[in-house]
Amino acid sequence: MAAKDVKFGDSARKKMLVGVNVLADAVKATLGPKGRNVVLAKSFGAPTITKDGVSVAKEIELKDAFENMGAQLVKEVASKANDAAGDGTTTATVLAQAIVNEGLKAVAAGMNPMDLKRGIDKATAAVVAELKNLSKPCADSKAIAQVGTISANSDNSIGEIIAEAMEKVGKEGVITVEEGSGLENELSVVEGMQFDRGYLSPYFVNKPDTMVAELEGPLLLLVDKKISNIRELLPVLEAVAKAGRPLLIVAEDVEGEALATLVVNNMRGIVKVAAVKAPGFGDRRKAMLQDIAVLTGGQVISEEIGLSLETATLEHLGNAKRVILSKENTTIIDGAGADTEIEARVKQIRAQIEETSSDYDREKLQERLAKLAGGVAVIKVGAGTEVEMKEKKARVEDALHATRAAVEEGVVPGGGVALVRALAAIVDLKGDNEDQNVGIALLRRAVESPLRQITANAGDEPSVVADKVKQGSGNFGYNAATGEYGDMIEMGILDPAKVTRSALQAAASIGGLMITTEAMVADLPEDKPAAGMPDMGGMGGMGGMM
């Protein structure tokens, strides 16, 4: 085991503080409407220019192991805030820096670190409760667009396209962000249920110009096993041919003679048919087949419930208004399932989302919920260059998270004003002893730091602005974009309450941990002798090439 370097007390905390400040100073430059740009060097290609705090934080690694620990802990603040609300990472970093700097000064002056932390925790809980009281529901498209605009660094077009997407697919709908091919942002909405499986054979295509298979008013046969024997399918095919309607088969797979026979029947026009693999794998595939069954009013043909293909009748088949199959996707439009059953299924999936602890499972359940309850919207980000595209896409994703958070827990006045107003909750708050009171006072100063930083980035005087905002009340604040004072909500400067709350909680949590740090352990740097060049015999004239 490699030898370790151990530092204690003040010398450890000083090193950690250097790392905290290096990372936070780089990140906080991006805060607010007049946030500065940060240029990130890349090992290949052009450097990236960004105003996204997380992208800056991810790039920073320090040479000194102890300083690096401080930087990594602040990174943790940003990622905690990001995990909770999807945004507010820069605000969280600014708050954490203020808490750590003030806290370590107090510890150096002889205060008890544990009591300081208790004071900070007490004050944080009171401010969080006050933020809940201050929040207003975010119901209409205008408010959603404003939240998106603020989160996307004051880009109106991004706020508006997100509001439009939310309006079209509902609050439960899935909105994905992709790189577009044009200069402008585009929004496309998929009606009905879409899953990422395409037709099993190009011979099913009946619209050669667009290479899709379209079935009007089809019946849907849902099977949870492979179909390779055509004899199993014959009874259903005959019944469908008599009914004179097209058929879509969704099964684990259709192969061999079964697929060949379907293709021949389709080409001869005996039965209009198409086959597609069921989406997902394992248990998720079964669940998604059941979703399609509920949506179309059909039943999954499964031996687990005593149904086989030979005994399947038209009653077991689902119905839809239209089905479109492309090479990659299948879309079922206007399924004929009963509303009550769809609602029951939605309720069941919601309960599973509440219970699951896995982020991956939650995301997949959310997708299933959207396909049943809402729809799917795709925002295609347009830009002039690759560098701009990456930067813009990151901003759209941030804005999307922020608007979701706003719909969930409401909005508060932006620009750091909500935290200043929430100070009312801790003006008279007292701890159990003097050291706890110092912790409370320390948080009182720290919550002003986002407002001060936004002002500083805009080139104005932080103390003057902070003082004037504190003298005001309600939504009164400072619009750094225009340099005007006024009602923040009316000026359209809103923050999701969840983002502000998560930022403060993450900052207080990591800040408290750093203040109570007493020792740090890191690997000692190894002294390696400079390695000579290996012999490259037989390659005359190319010595020393790496």
Curated annotation (Swiss-Prot):
Keyword Chaperone appears in the UniProt entry: yes
Tell me where the signal peptide lies: none
The protein's superkingdom reads: Bacteria
The subcellular localization recorded is: Cytoplasm
Sorted alphabetically, the Gene Ontology BP terms of this entry are: protein refolding
GO CC field: cytoplasm
List the catalytic activities from the record.
ATP + H2O + a folded polypeptide = ADP + phosphate + an unfolded polypeptide
Any Pfam family the entry gives: Cpn60_TCP1
Q: Which of UniProt's keywords are assigned here?
A: ATP-binding, Chaperone, Cytoplasm, Isomerase, Nucleotide-binding
Residues noted as binding ATP in the record, renumbered to the chain:
30-33, 51, 87-91, 415, 479-481, 495
* Listed GO MF terms: ATP binding; ATP-dependent protein folding chaperone; isomerase activity; unfolded protein binding
Record-listed E.C. numbers: 5.6.1.7
Asked if the record carries the keyword Mitochondrion, the reply is: no
Kindly state the subunit structure of this protein.
Forms a cylinder of 14 subunits composed of two heptameric rings stacked back-to-back. Interacts with the co-chaperonin GroES.
What is the similarity comment for this entry?
Belongs to the chaperonin (HSP60) family.
Q: What does this protein do?
A: Together with its co-chaperonin GroES, plays an essential role in assisting protein folding. The GroEL-GroES system forms a nano-cage that allows encapsulation of the non-native substrate proteins and provides a physical environment optimized to promote and accelerate protein folding.
HAMAP family with a match to the protein in the record: CH60
Q: What is this protein called?
A: Chaperonin GroEL
Q: Which organism is it from?
A: Pseudomonas putida (strain ATCC 700007 / DSM 6899 / JCM 31910 / BCRC 17059 / LMG 24140 / F1)
User: Highest lineage ranks of the organism?
Assistant: Bacteria, Pseudomonadati, Pseudomonadota, Gammaproteobacteria, Pseudomonadales
Q: Gene symbol?
A: groEL
